[in-house]
Each structure stands twice: as C-alpha cells, then as structure tokens.
C-alpha cells in the first residue's frame, strides 16, 4: 500500500526544485489531495502552481474532480483568491463552490459566497438560488427553500415562470410534494403556468406513488386548456410502474396507442424497465421486440434496462447475449451498461468474467467511475479477496477516478472480514488517510477501527487513532488548509 500516508508529491522540503504541473485538472486534483492540511503544504502548492494559467474552465474542472472531496474543493477555491489575485472566479465557479458548501451544510460559507458574487456584480442568478434551495429541501428544510424563492428579489434576482418551475421541481424531487402543490396553488395566478409547470407537479405525485393525485393534475390540466405533451404521458406511465400498478400502466400504454400518441423510445424504455422490475421478463422482451417492429430504434438506455432486468432475475448469461447483440447492432455501451453487467457477473460469482469486462470497458475508452470501483471493491471485500480490493483502490488513486467517502467506508469494512491483525493496521491507515484528505468518518467507524486494533494487539496504533478522534471532534470541519 505505497500510497497510504503519502505526505506530499513533492520531494524537496523547500520546494525550490518543484516543476509546475501541467494545466490539467486531473494532475492538479491529485496534487491537492496528496497535500496534508499544513501551512507548509500551502507553500508547496503555491510554488507548484505559480505559473499555471488559471481559467474558469480549468478551475471548474478541478472543482468537479474534487466534488466528493468537498472541504478540499473549498480550500482550493479560496486558495486561488488568497494567492492568485490576478485570477477572478466567474459565476459558474461560484455556483459550484456554493453547491459544495451547501452540500456540507456550511450555510455561513454559502451566504458569504453569495454576498461576494453581488460585490463582484456577477450574480447571484436564478441558478444560484435553485442550487441553494435544492440543498435546503434535500436537508429536510422545505420552508427555507420556499422562503429563499420568495425573497430572491432582495438579492437582486427576480422571480419568473422559469424560477417558479424550478423551485417546484426542487421540492418535488426532494419528495416535498405537498409543499410544492401548496405553493403551486398559491402562486399559479401570479405566473402564467404552462405545460412544464403541470408536468413538474404531476411528476412529483408520481415520485411518491400517489397516482390518483397525478391523474387529478392531468385532468385539471386539460380542463384549463393546457395541452399535455408526450412528456406528460410518459411521466404518468412511469408513475404507474413505480407504484407497482402494472395493470394500470399497461392499460394507460394501450390507451396512448389507441389515441395515436407519438410513442417514442422513452415510452418503450419505460415499459420495458417497468415490466422487468416487476419480474415479467417475457413481457419486457415482447415490448422490446415490438418497438423494433414499429420502427422505433432502441437507445442505449433501452438496452441498459433489458440488461439490468436480466441480471436482477439471475439470467446473467442472457444479459451477456443482450450486451453482445447491442454491440453487434452498432450501439456503444456506456458506463451504466458496463456497471450493470459487471455487477451481474460478480453477483453470479463470475469474478474473472467481470474483471475481463472491466478490461474491455477500458480498452474501448469507457472510463470506470465511482460506481464501478466501489461495487467491485465491495464484492472483493465480502469474499475475502482483500488484496484485489486494495489493488483496485490503488488503481483509483493513480487514475482520474479518485477514491470518495464511500470507497473508504467500503474498504475499511472489508478489512474486518478476515479479522487479521495486519488487516486492522490497514484499516487504521485508511482511516488516517481518509481524515488527511478532508473526509468525515462517522463515530462508528472510529470506534470500530479502535476496537479492531485493540483486539488484535495493536495498542500503540490504537492510541494514535484515539488521539486523532479526540483532536477531530464529532465533525472534522473546523479549519481546513490546503
């Protein structure tokens, strides 16, 4: 485990011989993540990036790569302000930083960034408020999200139909549909609501499986002279399947065809996936074949739905056949396609075939993502293939897909499968590296690693972990440095 506890990518203590990294977001992100939270490393990073030609595109790319490393991303954002004063962040970079801060529940930071945008006369925009509202709603604070929308004008940003539709969508997607419907009824007279508005509300009711309410919205829509579109009908169809109302879904699909609705690939994919989830594989395949007969070309999403259905029903061999059929017909599998099939192969115990498929994936230029790595690491760990799990972890660290919080948690849990002393030491090192990179371990994780070290005779290392826990406190978001 060469990478664990790597204190720096730099070999010179003074940093005099450092060469600036290329203007490449992957290299910069790795440099940031390799740097412990010390003043000395601030200086090292400054020297390393002194001649980097910063642009909004480069900064945004780095922020996106650090998305799962929120504290480090914010350090980087503020670092440019403090040490590269010739560069000024644009609105898109502020929006990304605000989203990261809001996701970490750092609300004072969020509002500090918003006020800064105003002082620079680059915002905030409706998109900025949509970002913050979404984070409020997902954190269980829908009233704050609504208040934010109603008070947008106080920050120089005025409400319009688009922002109204956005706040409704934010509330609905966070399952606060009652609150969204209440706002819709209160303000629909103020805005000239359209098909998009009704589709948002209808989708909200479908998301929480209240299809009778969704049908009421559809009926009201027609009565008010607002024409439903194909998105409306596809949303309703998906809602029936989501609610497990297979018969209603099929009848609705037949009614769509009877009324000469322009059935598209999304419609067919919805039906294929819906039948598959319900375990009706034969009907799913029949609909898939029907769409081809009707001249509606399947999409990659359609094939993904069929492959997922077959894998979930322990028909992984048929899923492989479907995958090869997809490739033979000229479709290019995406990361979801590969992830679904790799998961199916691993679930069936076909580890070597899953590994071969991952290699094929990379050879075809499709980069594995967090889901790919984390899923494979989990399966390896559960089957005591700890060395293979650690090998994938090292591969993540040397590539563009850097380990995230889930990766560390999965791997630390995996170290407890064999209950070996050396595995407990690795778990401790992972925990230390995790904290060093700005992640926030749960108290349970600290205690589990402590107990594991103590029970396997690693008392000295356990004391080091205990000191770290005491120093860190319940949250590790006190003061971060790059």
UniProtKB/Swiss-Prot annotation:
* A cellular component term, taken from the record's GO annotations: mitochondrion
Question: Main site of residence?
Answer: mitochondrion
Read off the lineage from the record: Eukaryota, Viridiplantae, Streptophyta, Embryophyta, Tracheophyta
Purpose: Required for the trans-splicing of intron 1 of the mitochondrial nad1 transcript encoding the ND1 subunit of the mitochondrial membrane respiratory chain NADH dehydrogenase (Complex I).
Q: Which Pfam family, any one, appears in the UniProt record?
A: PPR
Q: What is this protein called?
A: Pentatricopeptide repeat-containing protein At1g74900, mitochondrial
- A single GO BP: RNA splicing
Task: Return the InterPro entries for the record.
Answer: Pentatricopeptide_rpt, TPR-like_helical_dom_sf
